[in-house]
Amino acid sequence: MKFYIEDLLVYFPYSYIYPEQYSYMVALKRSLDNGGPCILEMPSGTGKTVSLLSLISSYQVKNPSIKLIYCSRTVPEIEQATEEARRVLQYRNSEMGEESPKTLCMSMSSRRNLCIQPRVSEERDGKVVDALCRELTSSWNRESPTSEKCKFFENFESNGKEILLEGVYSLEDLKEYGLKHQMCPYFLSRHMLNFANIVIFSYQYLLDPKIASLISSSFPSNSIVVFDEAHNIDNVCINALSINIDNKLLDTSSKNIAKINKQIEDIKKVDEKRLKDEYQRLVNGLARSGSTRADETTSDPVLPNDVIQEAVPGNIRKAEHFISLLRRVVDYLKSRLKSQMLLSESPLAFLQGLYHATQISSRTLRFCSSRLSSLLRTLRINDVNQFSGISLIADFATLVGTYNNGFLIIIEPYYQRQNNTYDQIFQFCCLDASIGMKPIFDKYRSVVITSGTLSPLDIYTKMLNFRPTVVERLTMSLNRNCICPCILTRGSDQISISTKFDVRSDTAVVRNYGALLVEVSAIVPDGIICFFTSYSYMEQIVSVWNEMGLLNNILTNKLIFVETSDPAESALALQNYKKACDSGRGAVLLSVARGKVSEGIDFDNQYGRCVILYGIPYINTESKVLRARLEFLRDRYQIRENEFLTFDAMRTASQCVGRVIRGKSDYGIMIFADKRYNRLDKRNKLPQWILQFCQPQHLNLSTDMAISLSKTFLREMGQPFSREEQLGKSLWSLEHVEKQSTSKPPQQQNSAINSTITTSTTTTTTTSTISETHLT
């Protein structure tokens, strides 16, 4: 359908639209008109992605110079967004005909997901793929007449830069195009990003400085940036600027230094001019000159605004001097890790200690990362991953030399499970997520932060330190209540249930938790997903259930599958869980909050008719890094410790229960099995689209009350439900859309405005005449 939102004609590729989709697009349009950042929460499974793409692609028709940069978390989400973009653009083009603008939508991923070179693509490890690719595509390898080359890359270098693509290219499309034209999909994608109207890739290509400066630094400032599924965006920013160092890494770094030193000595004997040329480039401030796109590995780990645009200091221009400096840094870090005490200090205090011991200044440290990259290129090293140890040390040196505020260094014992010993770990921690977001907010005209679970919205604006132009928290419009939340506070024996540390192992609590699953598995059809607070607690409670005979009772109703920390095992368990649901046998999947199942996998329709959340998934508060971050948030942004911990736990809980609702025709039971969920300060941090169903009869339930409520709910959901019943309330046709005040064509809006002005003028004239008569 086509409809107006104010002065914008929107092309929406479906015949019907949800009211919340329309409201979402109105808020998004208002944000784009105003510019600046916005934060939008929309119910899970109500078509957020297609709403975004429809509105923004229509906005691009009116503003053709604007680029859309769409960021998501995982490869499946990138592929899903690309297919939605294909659907939106096909509809727009069919409606506009010859007037439709030529549009390129380009997705992007790693070499591992795009490589088509037979020998390289059969490797599963991404680091190995990267190394083999660089071996075949580096400029020095290609100069050698005897070395093996990649024909796909050679064809791209010869013809790829002249190609003008049009249409939508998913990762699979790129690989097919590459095979058909014998051209490298990875480098083609990287090249075409600069010309694409719509770019779809992962967060790291924009938020991780080491990658962003190579991939997205040339994007125009009038672009629209969308962070979809952005409920964990603060953690992405923090992880991109944090580094952990242990003794094993330092030993690897020492070996790396020795190996590099030997290669320098070898080159001096056969090709000393190469080192002299590099020295001259560094003197002239041209560290990257002479390198090609294929030679570049990663860039500086610091944000673009903080990169020093000047020549490398004289004391590290010579390769041997630089290696000597790295050796001193590594030795100093080794000495710091010898202490068995827990230590925390600011970067400034660390730099003072380093300078006192080694005479290395912070200014010199800032150049370590770029200097090492230059040296590895000069030495013509393809497999840079074998030097990952010293590369991480160089990244740390650059970061600690650049940043002070919002960072902390923590040295603490770390338990090594495989050796059953404690080893010291040196952690350079970013505490302030706003540092990573600031360059994005500063550069781009519009930044959209959106997800189904962003509540409470105000805490994101504090943590990321921005003032949104638009804030919207949408509810779900429904003709029937397809969500049944149950706040379970006690078992059928009226004993309170909770995973609080002091009661979580209580026999009565564990028994009640098991009895709940037995009863739920007897009445709920198809699939049930259970989330525990940790792997250790899941193992503990399942073991006790087995001793009590509860697992056998569950198995009479459904099969049981378990998520583990091993990705391959979990993938197999998930595959068999879905098979059991498809066959009608039904299944229970035992998984962990903050695990893979809780974040990236949807359980629509028969795969998720009920989700049980055992306890509140609080993060481990014993972590010294977390304690430091909590203190920072309290002092800097006035976010209280308990406020953040509850917020973090409830967004994780929302993600878990949101897995089972993937559309309005879907339905599911959400059981929050912990008495603490009944407290208002916890419950109010759930998304609005869940809260709207938390009526008094859903609160403070015992197991038998929850089972009774669930039976009634499932009977209601089993009744026939047609599209006609939804029309007008939870589903709109074009007729319903056009009745909205914001959906009048511009001519009608202008007529209404002119009519108002005319009426106002007439009234003013009449009033003026009366006043003059009165004065006379």
Curated annotation (Swiss-Prot):
GO terms for biological process: DNA damage response; nucleotide-excision repair; positive regulation of mitotic recombination; transcription by RNA polymerase II. Residues 7-277 form the Helicase ATP-binding domain. InterPro entries: ATP-dep_Helicase_C (IPR006555), DinG/Rad3-like (IPR045028), DNA/RNA_helicase_DEAH_CS (IPR002464), HBB (IPR010643), Helic_SF1/SF2_ATP-bd_DinG/Rad3 (IPR014013), Helicase-like_DEXD_c2 (IPR006554), P-loop_NTPase (IPR027417), RAD3-like_helicase_DEAD (IPR010614). Its cofactor is Mg(2+); [4Fe-4S] cluster. SUPFAM superfamilies: P-loop containing nucleoside triphosphate hydrolases (SSF52540). It is found in: Nucleus. Its main location: nucleus. One of its GO terms (molecular function) is 4 iron, 4 sulfur cluster binding. Gene3D superfamilies: 1.10.275.30, P-loop containing nucleotide triphosphate hydrolases. PROSITE patterns: DEAH_ATP_HELICASE, HELICASE_ATP_BIND_2. Signal peptide: none annotated. Keywords: 4Fe-4S, ATP-binding, DNA damage, DNA repair, DNA-binding, Helicase, Hydrolase, Iron, Iron-sulfur, Isomerase, Magnesium, Metal-binding, Nucleotide-binding, Nucleus, Transcription, Transcription regulation. ATP binds at M42, P43, S44, G45, T46, G47, K48, T49. Residues 742-754 have a biased composition (Polar residues). Component of the 7-subunit TFIIH core complex composed of XPB/repB, XPD/repD, gtf2h1, gtf2h2, gtf2h3, gtf2h4 and gtf2h5, which is active in NER. The core complex associates with the 3-subunit CDK-activating kinase (CAK) module composed of cycH/cyclin H, cdk7 and mnat1 to form the 10-subunit holoenzyme (holo-TFIIH) active in transcription. NCBIfam families: rad3 (TIGR00604). ATP-dependent 5'-3' DNA helicase, component of the general transcription and DNA repair factor IIH (TFIIH) core complex, which is involved in general and transcription-coupled nucleotide excision repair (NER) of damaged DNA and, when complexed to CDK-activating kinase (CAK), in transcription by RNA polymerase II. In NER, TFIIH acts by opening DNA around the lesion to allow the excision of the damaged oligonucleotide and its replacement by a new DNA fragment. The ATP-dependent helicase activity of XPD/repD is required for DNA opening. Belongs to the helicase family. RAD3/XPD subfamily. This is General transcription and DNA repair factor IIH helicase subunit XPD. It comes from Dictyostelium discoideum. The lineage of its organism: Eukaryota, Amoebozoa, Evosea, Eumycetozoa, Dictyostelia. The gene is repD.
